[in-house]
Structures are given as C-alpha cells and as structure tokens.
C-alpha cells in the first residue's frame, strides 16, 4: 500500500510530502527504490539523503543491484569518495548523467548543482539537525519528498497526524522476511 500511495502522490499535481513509517526490515528501502525508479522514468533525478557514510554505501549497493537491468545510473556521494571521484560525480549530476544519487550531508552542499531534481528521499530524518533541515526546505519547494523512518520524531509525526504531511504505515513485514 505504501508503494501505491507514493505512486499516486508522484502522479498528482501537487508535490508529494509523505512519511513512510515501518519497522526495520519492513520494506521502506524498497518503496524508495521504486519511487526513485519512477522518477527516473519521468526523466527526473532523485536524491537519497542518509545520515552516515556506511548507510550511503549500503543504499548505493541496494539501489544499484535492484536497478542493474534498467538504463538508470546510480551513484553515491560521501566523504569516503576521493576528491577526483567527488568532482566527477558532481559534474555528472549537473549534466544529468546520474539519475539517482545517494549521499550524506554532502548532497546539500553549495557545490551540488542539479540537472532536474524531482524526488528527495530522506532516510532517518530524526538524525539530521535543524540547519540541515533548513537547507532541505530551501531545496524542495517543487520537489516530491519522501521521508522514511522506523522512529519518527514527535514533530514529524505531529505534522503527519495534523494532515500537513501524508503518512503511510507499514504494519507487516514482506513475505519470506527472516526475523532480525
């Protein structure tokens, strides 16, 4: 249902602002992969913002592996990349060669230029500070936004409950999921 909600939001006239809540291993990342793929099919770039370098690389591997059979270019940006690699990624992002970029705070830096950003995915929003969120607000005026969290902060949850933000709750694990 969360995937259907996101798809419907992305096809509506107003920009999506949806919170997807679900326990660890319930499929939030899969919802994000599908949303980013839909954005790429619509010739829009997607940015996946994560709080740590390790998570950036894990998500990069997941997105890359899930989309390897499609003409979608996935890359990542974090402090683990060399200056040369970072420069190349930033150039490719600006020229539109990268469809899906996954990264840490580096994604909201002044030197990041987008070709046509259409979707912003924020994983674990509660781990980002106020200044990061302010930069995100400036970045996402006409961009679909998907926030994923297993433990949303009260303010985020309140916005969803008030109706200022849409919310999908993943209550059941995917079939064949092994317990963690």
Where are the regions a protein language model picked out?
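P-loop (Walker A) phosphate-binding loop of NTP-binding proteins
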Residues: 23, 51, 150
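Conserved helix-turn-beta segment of the N-terminal RecA-like "Helicase ATP-binding" lobe
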Residues: 55-94
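Hydrophobic residues in beta-strands of the RecA-like P-loop NTPase core, especially within AAA+ ATPase
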Residues: 21, 102-103, 121-122
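Conserved RecA-like ASCE P-loop NTPase motor core of nucleic-acid helicases/translocases
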Residues: 45-55
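Post-DEXD/H (motif II) to motif III coupling segment of the RecA-like Helicase ATP-binding lobe
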Residues: 57, 114-119, 124-180
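Pre-Walker A segment
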Residues: 1-47
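Post-Walker A helix-loop "phosphate-sensing" segment adjacent to the P-loop in P-loop NTPases
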Residues: 39-47, 68-69, 142-144, 165-169
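Conserved motor-coupling elements within RecA-like helicase/translocase cores
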Residues: 80-101, 109-117
């Amino acid at each position: 249902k969360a995937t259907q909600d996101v798809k419907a939001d992305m096809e509506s006239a107003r920009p999506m602002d949806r919170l997807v809540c679900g326990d660890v291993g319930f499929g939030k990342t899969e919802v994000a992969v599908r949303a980013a793929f839909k954005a790429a099919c619509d010739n829009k770039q997607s940015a996946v913002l994560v709080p740590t370098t390790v998570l950036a690389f894990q998500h990069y591997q997941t997105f890359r592996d899930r989309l390897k059979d499609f003409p979608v270019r996935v890359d990542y940006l974090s402090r683990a990349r060399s200056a040369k690699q970072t420069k190349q990624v930033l150039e490719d992002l600006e020229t539109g060669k990268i469809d899906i970029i996954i990264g840490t705070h580096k994604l909201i830096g002044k030197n990041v230029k987008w070709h046509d950003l259409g979707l912003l995915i924020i994983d674990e929003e509660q781990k980002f500070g106020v200044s990061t969120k302010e930069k995100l607000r400036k970045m996402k005026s006409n961009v679909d936004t998907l926030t994923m969290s297993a433990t949303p902060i009260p303010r985020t949850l309140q916005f969803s409950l008030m109706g200022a933000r849409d919310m999908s709750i993943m209550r059941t694990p995917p079939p064949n999921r092994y317990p963690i």
